[in-house]
Amino acid sequence: MDFHSVLRMAAAKPGPDGVMKRYSLAVGPPRKDPKVKGVNSAAVQAFLRKKDQEIQNKEVEAKRKKEGLLAKRKELKHDRKARAMASRTKDNFRGYNGIPVEEKPKKHKGSGLEEGPNESMQSTEEDEEYMTEEELYEYSQSESEREEEQEEMPPQKVAKAAPGKKPPPPALNFTELLRLAERKQHEPVEVIRPLKKEERLRTAEELKELEFLERKAQKADRKDPMRNGQVVKISKGSGDKYYSLKGSHSVEKRSHENSKSSSTEQNGTFRKSSSDNRSREEKSGSVFHTKDSKFPTKSSSAKDCGAKGFRPSATGDCKNRNDSTRASGSTSLRPSSGGSSSVSGRPSGSSEKPGSSSGKPMGGSGSSSARSSSGSGKPTGATGSGKPTGASGSGSARSVGESGSRSGKPTGASGSGLARSVGASGSGSGKPTGATDSGRPTGVSGSGSARSVGASGSGKPTGASVSGSARSVGASGSGKPTGASGSGSARSVGASRSVSGKPTGASGSGKPTGAPGASSGKPAGVSGSVSSFARPRSNSSMAPAKPAASSGSARPSSSGTPRASSTGNSSSNYSRQASSSGAVRPSSGPPTGGTPKGPSPRPGTGPNSVRHNTTSISVSARSSLGSGPGRPVAASATGQSAMAKPKCTVVAETISSKNFVPKSINGHMNGMRSAVPPGHRPNMQPPGRPLPPITSSYKRRIDDDEYDSEMDDFIDDGGECQDEISKHIREIFGYDRNRYRDESDYALRYMESSFREQQKEEARSLRLGIQEDLEELRREEEELKQKAKQLKSAKKMKSR
């Protein structure tokens, strides 16, 4: 039977009663009973009498209960103290009479019935004797509730048992399905378009809050990382550990959308939607694309480009201009020169290749460098290794990028992109050199030389090639960073490329100035110099010729101890540095090869020079790390790159103190990776004139710049008073306020420990204490045994 014949038959057969129904117009009976005037007094009085009786009964009942409780209280009072002490023991919540009480299953009613009502009464009386009053009260309450429930329960059980399970609805048979299909096939289907909601820009506080919540969720995830069946890598690197669990497809899709939307918003809008902001943790675990696979995530770079206030590269949509310059040797990373120079985002899961504007995964390091500025585009990561170093998981690439400088080529040295990734993960060196400005972890290890990406063979990054040279600092052959500091230097020069397209590095030439053994592509002065030359030109900086002064580039301070003010972050302090977001480069240990050579180090720039990452203590107190990408990156940066995995993560933000110069162990910092501070957000300042290089007097100058007429009537007690106060504080606590004077509030907040941390600390010390006690006991036993042996041997000697 087909559809039409069914319809015909239905039309032919009228319903069972063919008689048409009509409405009757007759008025029906009234719905409510008519009200009778007057009151039926007898009924009302009877009702009132009944009520009074009930009230009296209740009062009597209450009185009896109260008397019973008072009597019990008297009984209990005499040994209350003993009982209180006993009730604090762990064994049981009742009083403790020396015999551990077995917790009885809570079937008071059932067991009572079996043993006879009298016995059950006695047992409850005994229990009650040992209970404190509050317990008694709660206990009696819950017992009465339980009794009521149990009385009600049996009938319910019987009722439930009868019907059994409902039979499942009969399945549609095939013909019905066909009919249904025929009916539905021509009906239009509503396609619900997801509404795209423009997210408003968020304030720093909101961002911090969001990040905090996200981290919280991540912690929960960490407990069961095997979600959706995928193994997820946890990136040790950044303070916020992102678990990326998303399927790679969704990642691709999302990144496409992001890139579309962000590229449209030019100059300006620097949209900080959280999604952009984090460039979503990408699914790291399962997608390690091998080197050459192509991966569309354009997002981070595109986003950058749109996203920051800076104007995206001249073309407007960060295009990777350089596609072609793909470093020949390097893993296929292709630097994207997209204007967005820095993606400082956090390393996104491996899959996301930050710079990805180039569109291919950066050698696995992808993630770690996710932050590499997109400009740098390719994390040089362990280049060879093919898997993201470390951070892979970390996932959120927050693009910080000041998007590219006007020239459209990446400005920040790879922009802050410091790949914060820390995990030693695949690469031998295991850890990306972290910030190494170039943003790409220079995990030397795998590739040995992590060859500079940029200029493919030539060793000098090609102009746009942007950070083009991820070159790992290690002498290429050596496979390990040269100079202890090695890793630090991974800083790519490329970025430094000035507007003109040639590296502005002080050295001027595209190639790093004298890296010791390395090929020219390597940054100079073994990392020590932290690529001194690679001074990325700050976005804003205009003159092509000179490295942007303010730019965050790390130029090693002449002294050689890198003074690290990370420029990027101290957003507060001087967010004015244009480049600030630019790159902070951790300097790796004090530069080993002497100070960087060549013009590059500019003494004046000291503060802005490299940031030391050491154990999270940044050398320059000034960098207020908090804000942007400037965060020091993985310790690996500190020259440790060779070390396998950092042992501990320093709390969220590195705390810098001016007078602390990390001690170098044969040139390496003994660094621990410092994690990214949770709340940080790249500091954005509108593109503007480049600031003069920040010199040691920068503090004074900034104070002048920040003069605010409204603050004229602000009453300040004056420095004198503060010093007095800090003197007293020092006397009491041995605390030196001056030491933290330049610290951002943000950093200081992380110096305080939370209650939870204290608890952890206590638990840890307790554990250690127990271990020590056990060891002592063992030692004592051994000593006793030895003494016994000696006695025996002495006796034997005597007997002979």
From Swiss-Prot:
* Source taxonomy: Eukaryota, Metazoa, Chordata, Craniata, Vertebrata
List where Low complexity composition bias occurs: 155-164, 328-360, 367-377, 390-424, 443-501, 514-581
Q: In which family does this protein belong, per the annotation?
A: Belongs to the SPT2 family.
Quote one Gene Ontology molecular function term. histone binding
Important for interaction with DNA: region residues: 1-687
Query: Which InterPro entries does the record associate with it?
Result: Chromatin_SPT2 (IPR013256), SPT2_N (IPR054552)
Instruction: Give the location in the cell.
Output: Nucleus, Nucleolus
Its domain comment says:
The acidic C-terminal domain mediates interaction with histone H3/H4 complexes.
The UniProt regions of compositional bias labelled Polar residues, in chain numbering, are 260-272, 608-626
Instruction: Show the segment(s) annotated as Important for interaction with histones.
Output: 688-800
What job does this protein perform? Histone chaperone that stabilizes pre-existing histone tetramers and regulates replication-independent histone exchange on chromatin. Required for normal chromatin refolding in the coding region of transcribed genes, and for the suppression of spurious transcription. Binds DNA and histones and promotes nucleosome assembly (in vitro). Facilitates formation of tetrameric histone complexes containing histone H3 and H4. Modulates RNA polymerase 1-mediated transcription. Binds DNA, with a preference for branched DNA species, such as Y-form DNA and Holliday junction DNA.
Entry keywords, A to Z: Coiled coil, DNA-binding, Nucleus, Transcription, Transcription regulation
Principal localization?
Answer: nucleus
**A GO cellular-component term linked to this record:** nucleolus
Listed name of the protein: Protein SPT2 homolog
Question: Where do the record's region annotations for Disordered lie?
Answer: 70-173, 197-646, 661-698
Subunit notes for this chain?
A: Interacts with histones. Interacts with a heterotetrameric complex formed by histone H3 and H4, especially when the histone tetramer is not bound to DNA.
Where does the source fall among the domains of life? Eukaryota
Could you tell me where the Basic and acidic residues compositional bias lies? 197-226, 249-259, 273-295
Q: Which GO terms describe its biological process?
A: heterochromatin formation; nucleosome assembly; regulation of DNA-templated transcription; transcription by RNA polymerase I
Q: Where is the composition biased (Pro residues)?
A: 684-693
Question: Acidic residues compositional bias: what residue ranges?
Answer: 124-137
Q: Which residues form a coiled coil?
A: 53-82, 196-224, 756-800
Which Pfam families does the entry mention? SPT2, SPT2_N
